[in-house]
Curated annotation (Swiss-Prot):
Protein species of origin: Homo sapiens (Human)
Localization: Cytoplasm; Cytoplasm, Cytoskeleton
Entry function: Microtubule-associated force-producing protein involved in producing microtubule bundles and able to bind and hydrolyze GTP. Most probably involved in vesicular trafficking processes, in particular endocytosis.
Renumbered residue ranges of the record's region G5 motif: 235-238
Modification type Phosphoserine: residues: 769, 773, 853
Keyword Disulfide bond: no
UniProt gene name: DNM3
Gene Ontology annotations for the cellular component aspect, listed alphabetically: cytoplasm; dendritic spine; extracellular exosome; microtubule; perinuclear region of cytoplasm; plasma membrane; postsynaptic density; presynapse
Primary location class: cytoplasm
Protein name in UniProt: Dynamin-3
Domain GED, residue spans: 659-750
Region spans: Disordered: 747-869
Enzyme class: hydrolase
EC number(s) given by UniProt: 3.6.5.5
């Protein structure tokens, strides 16, 4: 390859790519595309070939490039080419690449000059290129030939615009030196899509083919028709050179010789030629790379900060240290104990806001689930009265009793107390499950050491199972203690006298636990507050709507909002029951309903009041609160109602009074027992289970771990953890290295600032006014006689320059003395113009040029507007 400037950029980009590859990421460094735009046979393909440094594009007269060629350069160790339409086939001979381009063009467009917008995609892999995209476009033409359509100009224009409108596309506006620059379609198109001129570089070709005695010095010096980034002159190989197999390297030497030997260009030879064009383009690539570095730097610094804390822990990791495993084991067990205690006892720091902790769930078991299970088992009033009746009758036997037998009371009470074993044991099971779940969550931090995690779970779970048996034995013992002696002398027990008084009441409301006879004087104590949705209100009446509900021992009220200022309704709890409602597949809400046992409307004209919650846990919690207020669940009774009604109907008034008396006594005594059990069971579980497990973890877990397995086995890291640690450390180093490389690139490269804007309005003017002739915009060489101006065809050629650095643009030809030059508002920094002197002939060519002097600054003065129109 012949692009030395590109080869200097390759190491920088490769270092950046390598740094990102070490991170396992792709470096999204999208370098600009380079598109060549110009008329037919302007030398576009030759410019592109010279930039790449390879001969691979078709050549000839007329329209040769008839389809866009999208050339992707890919950095690779091997050098070959691939076509998208020939997948899998590698071209190592670039003459074959040229033939394939011609064949593929003819396949789509035909053999008779047809064109197509379907691009040919070619990839060239080489160690001497950057990852760039170059685009060779068809030449701009106006008259169709051969098979070309009538709107050939429009089609080619649209084809070109598809590529050059992209912001990351550098535009090489190619114009031959032997044509009129003011009519350059390439410059006009570039101006449309790049009005600021930041992406456009003018390229003047065929300087060696200009008419004898003319040159393009004023154009190349950016004086005549200025562009923001100026012009670069190049000399491409002729068809004769190509046929003679003249390579690009030899062509560049000939080009260099041309500019150094030509009298009009030798003073700007260092800014002319293909090498300088390569330098300009590669400088734009360098600018682009430097512009992308801040984003890369910010991205890498963010990643570095995110892993820095974790890497700090790994930095002190010394696998060869024999004390490391002992220290790590001790720290792990201590951390596990702290985490377990925080999850059970609660903690103010690092509070989980997404789910309840183990301690919070156990609290719900103690104060919501356990009371709910107790109340659920004793709500069957009809069954209880039947049992009391049977007990009284069986105690009396064949005799007719005159008094209420206290043995019937004891028998019924003992049977009811024994029923408490089920809810009590169930609460133990629920607490055990939560403890095990808490242990599993705490051992997640031990996952880096699989054997340690497994052994910790096993040892703690075994201890919990051991305590399970002792806790359940103690719970059963508490129940048996209550059964063993019925204390009718308890201060809260109503006694027979009060029971008989209460039996005279027709309507009695059953109470729950300690909400029975020992209620406070005010029954307006709030049991629960919260948001609920009344879901069974029809759409015509407003539809489902959320309200703020307040539950007391006497009523259920709801308000518009939680400020409790606007009360919507108050529902008394008398004769109310609660039941579940099947969840609708159309709704995500969980619903329960309240209804009246006497078939009365609960709310307005509704028999049921359906209330919706967001979760089943909320439903269970509200049902437990309603139970505390005396609202029982509805449960279909499977007894034979007819027999029960017959027996009730057959009871004599005395037996009925005795049943009612014992029922009141049982209710009073069971409220005492329930209060006691609800208080003692949580305390028993807390003492024998939860506190014991905490003490075991703090005092004995470490010793059992040491005795269970070898320490080295316990502290053996998982393969995943070792890999993660290595990856973290590697990524940390790679990030630091990448940041260093970015810093090196920023230091080693220099951004070239964009040139100041110029007045390029001549591109628009050229559409409205007649353009100057090609001959008048080319100046004569210093050895040629002064050309005669053509009247009415624009400005005359400029006078010869007295020195290499004092050239002036053309001067208007006017007889007689000239008036002083008016000051122009155009400010594009052109050198001053030299007035003509009619009193004497123009100076001849000096035989010796004065050497360029740095002490002679060039005075810059605006051009006359008349020279541009």
């Amino acid at each position: 390859m012949g692009n030395r400037e590109m080869e200097e950029l390759i190491p920088l980009v490769n270092r950046l790519q390598d740094a990102f590859s070490a991170l396992g990421q792709s470096c999204l460094l999208e370098l600009p595309q380079i598109a060549v735009v110009g008329g037919q046979s302007a030398g576009k393909s030759s410019v592109l070939e010279n930039f790449v440094g390879r001969d691979f594009l078709p050549r000839g007269s007329g329209i040769v490039t008839r389809r866009p060629l999208v050339l992707q350069l890919v950095t690779s160790k091997a050098e070959y080419a691939e076509f998208l339409h020939c997948k899998g086939k590698k071209f190592t001979d670039f003459d074959e690449v040229r033939l394939e381009i011609e064949a593929e063009t003819d396949r789509v467009t035909g053999m008779n000059k047809g064109i197509s917008s379907i691009p040919i995609n070619l990839r060239v892999y080489s160690p001497h290129v950057l990852n760039l995209t170059l685009i060779d476009l068809p030449g701009i033409t106006k008259v169709p030939v051969g098979d070309q359509p009538p709107d050939i100009e429009y089609q080619i224009r649209e084809m070109i615009m598809q590529f050059i409108t992209r912001e990351n596309c550098l535009i090489l506006a190619v114009t031959p030196a032997n044509t009129d620059l003011a009519n350059s379609d390439a410059l006009k198109l570039a101006k449309e899509v790049d009005p600021q001129g930041l992406r456009t570089i003018g390229v003047i070709t065929k300087l060696d083919l200009m008419d004898e005695g003319t040159d393009a010095r004023d154009v190349l010096e950016n004086k005549l028709l200025p562009l923001r980034r100026g012009y670069v002159g190049v000399v491409n190989r002729s068809q004769k050179d190509i046929d003679g197999k003249k390579d690009i390297k030899a062509a560049m030497l000939a080009e260099r010789k041309f500019f150094l030997s030509h009298p009009a260009y030798r003073h700007i030879a260092d800014r002319m030629g293909t090498p300088h064009l390569q330098k300009v383009l590669n400088q734009q690539l360098t600018n682009h790379i430097r512009d992308t570095l801040p984003n890369f730097r910010n991205k890498l610094q963010g990643q570095l900060l995110s892993i820095e804390h974790e890497v700090e822990a790994y930095k002190n990791f010394k696998p060869e240290d024999p004390t490391r495993k002992t220290k790590a084991l001790l720290q792990m067990v201590q951390q596990f104990a702290v985490d377990f205690e925080k999850r059970i006892e609660g903690s103010g720091d690092q509070v989980d806001t997404l789910e309840l902790s183990g301690g919070a769930k156990i609290n719900r078991i103690f104060h919501e689930r356990f009371p709910f299970e107790i109340v659920k088992m004793e709500f069957n009033e009809k069954e209880l009265r039947r049992e009391i009746s049977y007990a009284i009758k069986n105690i009396h036997g064949i005799r007719t009793g005159l008094f209420t037998p206290d043995m019937a009371f004891e028998a019924i009470v003992k049977k009811q107390i024994v029923k408490l074993k089920g809810p009590s044991l169930k609460s133990v099971d629920l607490v055990i499950q939560e403890l095990i779940n808490t242990v599993k969550k705490c051992t997640k931090k031990l996952a880096n050491f699989p054997r340690l995690c497994e052994e910790t779970e096993r040892i703690v779970a075994n201890h919990i199972r051991e305590r399970e048996g002792k806790t359940k034995d103690q719970v059963l013992l508490l129940i048996d203690i209550q059964v063993s002696y019925i204390n009718t002398n308890h201060e809260d027990f109503i006694g027979f006298a009060n029971a008989q008084q209460r039996s005279s009441q027709v309507h009695k409301k059953t109470t729950v636990g300690n909400q029975g006879t020992n209620l406070p004087p005010s029954r307006q104590i709030v049991i629960r507050k919260g948001w609920l949705t009344i879901s069974n209100i029809g759409i015509m009446k407003g539809g489902s709507k959320g309200y703020w509900f307040v539950l007391t021992a006497e009523s259920l009220s709801w308000y518009k909002d939680d400020e409790e200022k606007e009360k919507k309704y108050m529902l008394p709890l008398d004769n109310l029951k609660v039941r579940d409602v099947e969840k609708s597949f159309m709704s995500s809400k969980h619903i329960f309903a309240l209804f009246n046992t006497e078939q009365r409307n609960v709310y307005k004209d509704y028999r049921f009041l359906e209330l919706a919650c967001d979760s089943q846990e909320d439903v269970d919690s509200w049902k437990a609160s309603l139970l505390r207020a005396g609202v029982y669940p509805d449960k279909s009774v499977a007894e034979n109602d007819e027999n029960g009604q017959a027996e009730n109907f057959s009871m004599d008034p005395q037996l009925e009074r005795q049943v009612e008396t014992i029922r009141n006594l049982v209710d009073s005594y069971m409220s005492i027992i329930n209060k006691c059990i609800r208080d003692l069971i949580p305390k028993t579980i807390m003492h024998l289970m939860i506190n014991n497990v905490k003490d075991f973890i703090n005092s004995e877990l470490l010793a059992q771990l040491y005795s269970s397995e070898d320490q080295n086995t316990l502290m053996e890291e998982s393969a995943e953890q070792a890999q993660r640690r290595d990856e973290m450390l590697r990524m940390y180093q790679a990030l630091k290295e990448a940041l260093g490389i970015i810093g090196d690139i920023s230091t080693a490269t220099v951004s070239t600032p964009a040139p100041p804007p110029v007045d390029d309005s001549w591109i628009q003017h050229s559409r409205r006014s007649p353009p100057p002739s090609p001959t008048t915009q080319r100046r004569p060489t210093l050895s040629a006689p002064l050309a005669r101006p053509t009247s009415g065809r624009g400005p005359a050629p400029a006078i010869p320059s007295p020195g290499p650095h004092s050239g002036a643009p053309p001067v208007p030809f006017r007889p007689g003395p000239l008036p002083p030059f008016p000051s122009s508002s155009d400010s594009f920094g052109a050198p001053p113009q030299v007035p003509s002197r009619p009193t004497r002939a123009p100076p001849s060519v000096p035989s010796r040029r004065p050497p360029p002097s740095p002490t002679r600054p060039t005075i810059i003065r605006p051009l006359e507007s008349s020279l541009l129109d």
